[in-house]
Amino acid sequence: MIEKVSVVITAHNRKKYLLEAVNSVLHQVNPGVEIEIVVVKNFVDDKIDSFLMNSGAVNIYTDEESFGGKLSLGIDASSGNIICFLDDDDMFNPVKIGLIRMIFDENKGLLFVHNDIQIISEETTWNTARTTNEEASKFKVYSSEKLSRREWGKILSSRADWYVSCASMDAPFAKSISQIVYQSNRSLDKILFLLGTGKEASFGLCKNRLTMYRKHESITGLKTDVTDFRNRRLKFTKESIENLRRTFKSYIKGVNNLPYNYMLLKMEGNLAIYDKYRRGKTFRIMTAELKHFIRYGGEEYALLSMLLFLNIFSNRLSIRVFRYIQIRDI
């Protein structure tokens, strides 16, 4: 039986939204369990630190620069049966912890659960958010060993590998992979998904919108110069691919090849757009994305193939289109 849920909140330099994130956890409705808040940040702030102390939160200061390093510290410091992750600029729906606790309680052996999002504005606070009614659980359990190629395709197309604030994990398992998390700094959402849905794993997808995703300028990149946007995304994508490959090699006996290959293909499609590949190479990747869409589904692969076709004729135009259609990163 689940007795305690730990919420790991990480923050790097940014102070603006942190207390909103913490308050969204403190004001959970009928969680039915003890809640532990673990904040890992790289700054000292009297107001924030005083609030965290008065709230009984575990407040960890670190000089660690990487996201993975902070996440790993939070995992190691947690004492709950389940760990939920939360970025400092996001918030939880008031019923999230209660539903997640119930899901883990009713489905023994789960390692990983992913829930959906509700988009909120930059100005939204924990007490002004118009939350959706998510009391009835919309949840499905999967056994990784029983999934076909097409089923894996559908799962990844549902964005189950997207966004750390949507992820919850069995705490003992999270602690067992903490060192791998520590060594990663990009696409931690995909790393957690890849590890949590490994061989013989039981995992779940929850369609309830339990995470409030704050959409602001630093995320969308719409107000940045196209060249700057391309350069930043190019660096991010290259590092993400490197992280994904390193994780696969480090945990090769426990990772499923299919989701790894599917995620890698999607990243390579992104890279082909950002890196101004020659036409021949772009065409080969475009064909691979299209074949995947035809065989296994996933509208994002169809979209990437169309953008890559456009990229053959105009890299700048394809990047402009890519930037404007991204609500969630592809």
Regions found by a protein language model. Give the residues of each.
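Conserved nucleotide-sugar donor-binding catalytic segment
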Residues: 139-226
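Flexible acidic/His/Gly-enriched loops in nucleotide-sugar-dependent glycosyltransferase catalytic domains
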Residues: 64-69, 98-173
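N-proximal low-complexity "stem/linker" segments adjacent to membrane-targeting elements
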Residues: 1-24
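A conserved acidic beta->alpha catalytic loop
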Residues: 39-50, 87
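C-terminal subregions of glycosyltransferases and related glycan-biosynthesis enzymes
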Residues: 1-2, 149, 153, 186, ...
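Short aromatic/hydrophobic "clamp" motif used to bind/position activated sugar donors
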Residues: 83
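Glycine-rich, basic loop-to-helix element that forms the pyrophosphate-binding segment
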Residues: 62-78, 88
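Short, acidic, metal-binding catalytic loop of nucleotide-sugar glycosyltransferases
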Residues: 23-34
